[in-house]
Amino acid sequence: MVMFKKIKSFEVVFNDPEKVYGSGEKVAGRVIVEVCEVTRVKAVRILACGVAKVLWMQGSQQCKQTSEYLRYEDTLLLEDQPTGENEMVIMRPGNKYEYKFGFELPQGPLGTSFKGKYGCVDYWVKAFLDRPSQPTQETKKNFEVVDLVDVNTPDLMAPVSAKKEKKVSCMFIPDGRVSVSARIDRKGFCEGDEISIHADFENTCSRIVVPKAAIVARHTYLANGQTKVLTQKLSSVRGNHIISGTCASWRGKSLRVQKIRPSILGCNILRVEYSLLIYVSVPGSKKVILDLPLVIGSRSGLSSRTSSMASRTSSEMSWVDLNIPDTPEAPPCYMDVIPEDHRLESPTTPLLDDMDGSQDSPIFMYAPEFKFMPPPTYTEVDPCILNNNVQ
């Protein structure tokens, strides 16, 4: 029977636990070991990995794929480590043994740390404690990586525009048309930026329509020749009803980019893409949808501070209000931010339906609900008695 010697503590600690790393940066830390009794240690090893994984079931078939960004292995040594026979470290209770490590992330594109429904991109350091006649003990610590996306390139600073027209019919009888044209000042944005929307809407059909806009994320997973797409509605804004025979315009209508992860475009098995959808809800017919692609960048360097001022002229928000940190902040997990009722599979159209079931684009005009004025403030003190006492 093998008796297992108890280890008091065995953990990986990074020198900067809150840091978000980029390509080419050094990851440094130490492995800390404490024992409850005299213990012989053969070796302390580390394995650092960065892997993208996708996995889902397609009927009875398992679709699975991995892509590796980082792999680093090393055997660690103590500074002035005491050694016994066979070059083993003799650890004693009451002492803390620290093994330092450090390695550099690869240059070039790296997948941003991400966790989705059918896949993830994870980075971690795993430490192994090898002892004679004992099972190898393991401990693991994750760290965050962001692939820096520069939104100040000419391609991402260029305006994006589109237009679309849809003929509407009722019982196969033509009923006019609905047209939409829209433009945004640039394609690349960062968290906290305001997207300034310029759009024109025309309604010549007999129905009342409603213009809206939404930022939508698309997660694309690829494995074994199969593709899985998950669509998420992140934020939205709407305009006023457009009655028959009238037009409407948006001149700098703002939609803020919330706290979301940067776009992941360089991974061959997992992509995170964003779009600004400008659409018109037409009762009894399909929506008229414009899809303007977006690229969400990481917050670093100049970010989009100077190049997105044109899209901020219609907003009252200042850069002081954004409270930008000096170092990039770890992006949140999508599954923690997005409400469950907005996590829908493709296609996009059901995603754009309102969740509250309200009649915001009725065929007939509805009168607003009548509401009584609220009652006056109640008090148990009689003002007449107070006046008599004063006199």
Swiss-Prot record:
- Gene name, per UniProt, is TXNIP
Q: What does this protein do?
A: May act as an oxidative stress mediator by inhibiting thioredoxin activity or by limiting its bioavailability. Interacts with COPS5 and restores COPS5-induced suppression of CDKN1B stability, blocking the COPS5-mediated translocation of CDKN1B from the nucleus to the cytoplasm. Functions as a transcriptional repressor, possibly by acting as a bridge molecule between transcription factors and corepressor complexes, and over-expression will induce G0/G1 cell cycle arrest. Required for the maturation of natural killer cells. Acts as a suppressor of tumor cell growth.
Q: Which residues form a coiled coil?
A: none
For the modification Phosphoserine, the affected residues are: 361
Principal location listed in the UniProt entry: cytoplasm
Q: Which GO terms describe its cellular component?
A: cytoplasm; cytosol
The family line of this record is: Belongs to the arrestin family.
- Write down what this protein is called: Thioredoxin-interacting protein
Q: Which SUPFAM superfamilies match?
A: E set domains
The entry describes its oligomerization and partners as:
Homodimer; disulfide-linked. Interacts with TXN/thioredoxin through its redox-active site. Interacts with transcriptional repressors ZBTB16, ZBTB32 and HDAC1. Interacts with DDIT4.
Which Gene3D superfamilies would you find in this protein's record? 2.60.40.640
Q: What are the GO MF terms of this UniProt record?
A: enzyme inhibitor activity; ubiquitin protein ligase binding
- Biological processes annotated in GO: cellular response to oxidised low-density lipoprotein particle stimulus; cellular response to tumor cell; inflammatory response; keratinocyte differentiation; negative regulation of cell division; negative regulation of transcription by RNA polymerase II; platelet-derived growth factor receptor signaling pathway; positive regulation of apoptotic process
Name the InterPro entries for this protein: Arrestin-like_C, Arrestin-like_N, Arrestin_C-like, Arrestin_domain-protein, Ig_E-set
Pfam families attached to this UniProt entry = Arrestin_C, Arrestin_N
State where the record puts the cross-link Glycyl lysine isopeptide (Lys-Gly) (interchain with G-Cter in ubiquitin). 212
* Modification after translation, per record: Ubiquitinated; undergoes heterotypic 'Lys-48'-/'Lys-63'-branched polyubiquitination catalyzed by ITCH and UBR5 resulting in proteasomal degradation. Deubiquitinated by USP5, leading to TXNIP stabilization.
Q: What induces it?
A: Down-regulated in response to oxidative stress.
Compartments annotated for it: namely: Cytoplasm; Nucleus
